[in-house]
A protein has these predicted regions:
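Glycine-rich beta-alpha junction loops
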Residues: 40, 124-125, 196-201, 236-238, ...
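Conserved Rossmann-fold dehydrogenase catalytic segment
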Residues: 126, 153-163, 184-199, 219-224, ...
């Protein structure tokens, strides 16, 4: 595989998702990432299902090394400082002010390494009236207005994965790469800051654009209505998702697949504005038709007519999808102690080369000896060869 960030050294002082997700993005592209964790307990995500190797922890910690250090202790701080002196990037996702308490604030680390790109991830920003508040995924989704677009008012429940956590980490990685690019010209590092609140507000850009442009406050069904998106149950109990968008050819294809060319004779459904205005009636019509055939039958018909669709899979169905297999989307890893595991590879390919070689998440302090004196003498320690 192509490791476009090979030679880049990253120290991650992260917990849960945002910090670990940021460094995972860099590790997936070949960066050497050392995860600094508290001795004994490590990243709190480790213990979410008992033990210290939960699936929650595994999700965002592949392709990394782990060292157990308490930077409040002078002897551990010496090792930490050696890592910082040789690092390109430092990532933390503490509440504002806590990094300074554990001797990992920007000013101190910058004195050790002026080329260091220092990334600070927070819930609400480094200053301001909400800066000190605790924040987790749902908090950021709610504060940014995004959660209001997901929750069904008739049955208000938080749904879905930790989007705010993951997206904040991905934005952080994006900012880090920008600072590294600038450093090539200046020779100096930058402080990169991103908060979950800001990240999710930006991720929710469409809703704010509608607000500021036309005064529309979007709700859960605003975008699906305009994009003409539907989820429909089939005779077998499986579901299909359609996203018809604007081109009329897709609607003609759907009518052909349903063997219902007469659908356009109804003025409510004859045009895009009509279909949007009469969405509930259209969903009722489509729902009745789709319950007449099995999902596989519908998929074959929709493929033949070039209609934008996909089976609405359960997670356990996705690995069996023919395209997922073709793309080698799921890869196996092996840890000498924890055994075999499977994960989703990086979605990025470079010159057609996919990231198929993935190192398993490390056990707590697994690489203490390797980094006891700082970075190994080689330019970049190949974690993938080590775990092969």
């Amino acid at each position: 595989m192509t490791q476009v960030l090979k030679g880049l050294r990253v120290v991650e002082h992260g917990t849960f998702i945002t910090g670990p997700a940021a460094s995972m993005m860099l590790a997936d592209m070949g960066a050497e990432v050392v995860k600094v964790e508290l001795p004994g307990t490590g990243d709190p995500f480790r213990a979410f299902k008992g033990g210290l190797y939960s699936p929650h922890y595994q999700t965002y910690n592949r392709n990394k090394h782990s060292v157990a250090l308490d930077t409040r202790k002078p002897e551990d701080r010496e090792t930490f400082d050696r890592l910082i002196e040789g690092a390109d990037v430092y990532i933390q996702n503490f509440r504002p002010g806590f990094a300074e308490q554990i001797h990992a604030g920007e000013a101190r680390l910058r004195a050790l390494n002026e080329r260091l790109v220092y990334c600070a991830i927070s819930g609400f920003g480094q200053d301001g009236p909400a800066a000190g508040r605790p924040s987790y995924d749902t908090v950021a989704q709610a504060a940014s207005g995004y959660l209001r677009l997901l929750v069904n008012p008739a049955n208000p429940r938080v749904v879905g994965p930790a989007i705010a956590d993951a997206m904040t980490g991905y934005y952080a990685a994006f900012g880090i790469l920008g600072a590294l690019f600038e450093r090539q010209a200046t020779g100096r590092g930058r402080k990169v800051e991103v908060s979950m609140f800001e990240a999710m507000a930006h991720f929710n850009l469409d809703a704010f654009t509608h607000l500021f442009s036309v005064g529309e406050v979007m709700g859960p069904y605003s975008r699906p209505s305009v994009s003409q998106s539907y989820v429909l149950e089939c005779a077998c109990g499986g579901w299909i998702a359609l996203h018809m968008s604007s081109p009329e050819k897709f609607w003609q294809g759907l009518a052909n697949a349903m063997e219902r060319p007469d659908i356009f004779e109804d003025e409510r459904f004859a045009s895009r504005p009509g279909r949007i205005a009469n969405q509930d009636a259209l969903i009722e019509l489509l729902g009745g038709i789709f319950k007449s055939r099995r999902r596989d039958d519908w998929c074959a018909r929709l493929v033949e007519q070039d209609v934008p669709h996909a089976p609405m899979y359960r997670t356990d169905e996705v690995p069996e999808d023919a395209q997922a297999k073709h793309l080698q989307l799921f890869v196996d890893t092996h840890h000498p102690v924890m055994g075999d595991s499977r994960t989703v590879r990086s979605p990025l390919s470079f010159d057609g080369q996919r990231s198929l070689d993935v190192a398993p998440p490390p056990t707590l302090g697994e690489h203490n000896a390797l980094y006891a004196q700082g970075w190994p003498a080689t330019q970049a320690h190949d974690i993938k060869k080590e775990t092969a």
